[in-house]
Amino acid sequence: MIRRLAAFSALSGLATAWLPEVNKKITSTNGTNLFTSSNGKIRGVNLGSQFVFEPWIAEKAWSDMGCGGQKSEFDCVSRLGQANANSAFASHWGSWITQDDIAEMVSYGLNTIRVPVGYWMREDLVYSDSEHFPQGGLQYLENLCEWASDAGLYIIIDLHGAPGAQTPQNPFTGQYAPIAGFYQDYQFERALKFLEWMTTNIHQNDKFRNVGMLEVVNEPVQDAGKVGSMRSSYYPNAFKRIRAAEQSLNIDRNNYLHIQMMDRLWGSGDPNESLTDTYYAAYDDHRYLKWASVAVSKDSYISTSCSDQLNSNTPTIVGEWSLSVPDNVQWNSDWSPDSNKDFYKKWFAAQVTAYERQQGWIFWTWKAQLGDYRWSYQGGLLLTRPGIGDQQVLTL
């Protein structure tokens, strides 16, 4: 079981780095340490649409739930009614990511999962007269984390959907909100209560034993001037409340959770700006060249990824990335996933190499219904060479 990430240099060749198992090893129930082959680097996948459904990822599953045509979980629950929605989402939670998926991840050398969740998993935080979210998700999160812990995977739980929505018009917040309503004291307080509750669950429930990191909000607005209160109030209070919850349980400092924030490169300002204590702080960066200011050519993408340094707050995990390219070219002959597999393999290797200059990477996402491996690790291309960290894959 791991809670601690610490300084390390010998294996990586970097001046400083950190390894999940320096102080506490993660092992599966049969004693396997998945981090040995990766020299301690995080190599993982996101479990997109498991607990925060993004309809674009899996339109068929969304439609089968009775949610077709709805933009978000909030909208679907409003349409179906609470009881019918609870039944539909329970069926989804029990089938989208299974124990077989966890075993498949391990078989291909992955060692980490990032689990997006919404604040509504703590059901007493939901305003019953105005908010509509599925109920009953916690037991499915417990089961998932138990499977992953038994398999030896490291687990990051990510507050993907914040109260009021941290960004507008995006289903990854759980609601298709017209404005970003998160950046207010009363919404911060709801998120802080979620973090306290989640922290307590993690430390008291053995099923969560491999959860070592809690991300306090995913992808806030990329405008530092608009989210100053997040840096001055929410981030420092998140540290205080999480640590207070741990202290109330008499958790040893070595067993504290890492507290993760988006890094400075994300564009929401320096997360450390108002922090007085960064003990066990960690950082997240998301790197999608699809939307970056990069020339749209294969040479440019390879060159950019090979030279990516992503030097910002440390330690940083590249917590989301993909192989997708701009919408206007993604299906033409020069970029088609079927006829350009050699390029995508090289680009995958270039990105992996760059992100392992930091602490590692988590691909978005494990599973999709797009018929496009550029968004789905399980989709096939990325699994053609078991042991993703071997030299054949990482050498261009």
From Swiss-Prot:
SUPFAM superfamilies: (Trans)glycosidases
Gene: exgB
Keyword Glycoprotein: yes
Function: Beta-glucanases participate in the metabolism of beta-glucan, the main structural component of the cell wall. Acts on lutean, pustulan and 1,6-oligo-beta-D-glucosides.
Top-tier EC class: hydrolase
Gene Ontology biological-process annotations: cell wall organization; glucan catabolic process
Official protein name in the record: Probable glucan endo-1,6-beta-glucosidase B
EC number(s) reported in the record: 3.2.1.75
GO cellular component, one term: extracellular region
Cleavable signal peptide: 1-17
One function term, GO molecular function aspect: glucan endo-1,6-beta-glucosidase activity
One protein family per Pfam: Cellulase
Location, primary (coarse class): secreted
Reaction catalyzed: Random hydrolysis of (1->6)-linkages in (1->6)-beta-D-glucans
Cellular compartments annotated: Secreted
